[in-house]
Amino acid sequence: MPSIVSLTAALTFVGAVIASPVEKRSAFSVEQVPHTTYLKNGPAQKVKTLRKYGKPVPQSLLDAAESRDAVGETFTASAVGDGSDPAVPSDQYDSSYLSPVTVGSTTVELDFDTGSADLWVFSSLQASSQLSGHQYYQADASKLKSGYSWKISYGDGSGASGKVYADKVVVGGVTATSQAVEAATSVSAQFSRDSNTDGLLGLAFSSINTVSPEPQKTFFDTVKPQLAEPLFAVNLKYHAAGTYDFGYIDKSKYTGPITYVNVDDSQGFWGISATAYGVGGTTTQRAISGILDTGTTLVYTDTAIVKAYYAKVSGAKLDNIQGGYVFPCSATLPNFSITVGGVAQVVPGKHINYSPVDSSGTTCFGGIQTNDGLGMSIFGDIFLKSKYVVHEAAPDSPPRIGLAQSASV
């Protein structure tokens, strides 16, 4: 017969399991998965970024995106852009990075996106015509959050929407047993055509989650109380799969010190401030406000900064037909940096060559473009691929970003 002590301990254990949405305290790493099925389309990336942040898209940019000589990627004006868990480039030029996630009983490949706060997936609720080439969540009616819905919409009326479920989500070594899963009932053409990506896992702040009538917690916020440390770190790489580290900092992945700064989370993003920028060996003092966003491919910043950069690139020009700054692919590109927390965060020049704009590989599209229409700077994968970036959100202190030079650079 069990003792009162052992029975009490057992009941306490059961109560803890019921009360907690995750199974155990943990620290883990998730590796990305690469795809090499299409060439990058620089103008289309700009279109997707503008739409992601709810900004109007100039017709000239749409025209440039449509006329891009891409292999395996057709862009139309109606399209919508957008652990250590491994992150894999979704094309041969590192256009995006995907990571395996088990949602319910299905493993899908999701875009880990620090610029949004929704965990949404393709699902069995969609028409079969939208599911071709995708892995998708098998919706379980018993786990439906009745009365809840979600919708991501863009200026042209396109987007994605659906129902909300409370289900198991496994990322790397941790399981959230009651995570809000936004199951799509309908998605627009660009999402359904992109068979590389089965949805998004948002890692911005839960305040901008789109679920109605009540925003839901991100995966990070759900598992954070159970992590060894209340943080995740991003280690994207140049022409290679990167990782997401949850609950710990991997000292083997960076060199030098980590520079920490407080985050401006007033808009729900991982916002930072810089005091200067550098082009080659020249540093210019200038206040820059921006966000770090793994769901955006390029860097978008103030026009004066972009002009100053390409002024140092032989043959560079603003090409409206291509939708941005281009240069001879053979050009030597200077390093670029922003000063954050008193430390210059350097992006190697070779990272700023985004992709060719023609089949001959003569002219290339720049990885740094103007932020016209965005109202802020966005430091996407072009910036992040040379960094180890710590995202810390302790319950008793302001959120912080930590930046260090990646050991893989």
Curated annotation (Swiss-Prot):
Propeptide span(s): 20-65
GO cellular component assignments: extracellular region
Alphabetically ordered keywords of this record: Aspartyl protease, Disulfide bond, Glycoprotein, Hydrolase, Protease, Secreted, Signal, Zymogen
Enzyme's top EC category: hydrolase
Record-linked InterPro entries: Aspartic_peptidase_A1, Aspartic_peptidase_AS, Aspergillopepsin-like_cat_dom, PEPTIDASE_A1, Peptidase_aspartic_dom_sf
Matches recorded under Pfam families: Asp
Domain of life per record: Eukaryota
Function: Secreted aspartic endopeptidase that allows assimilation of proteinaceous substrates. The scissile peptide bond is attacked by a nucleophilic water molecule activated by two aspartic residues in the active site. Shows a broad primary substrate specificity. Favors hydrophobic residues at the P1 and P1' positions.
UniProt-annotated location(s): Secreted
Gene Ontology biological process: proteolysis
Primary location group: secreted
Secreted among keywords: yes
EC numbers: 3.4.23.-
Active site per database record: 113, 293
Domain Peptidase A1 residues, every copy: 97-404
Carbohydrate-modified residues: 335
Signal sequence, start to end: 1-19
Species of provenance: Leptosphaeria maculans (strain JN3 / isolate v23.1.3 / race Av1-4-5-6-7-8) (Blackleg fungus)
PROSITE patterns (alphabetical): ASP_PROTEASE, PEPTIDASE_A1
Protein name: Aspartic protease pepA
SS bonds (residue pairs): 329-364
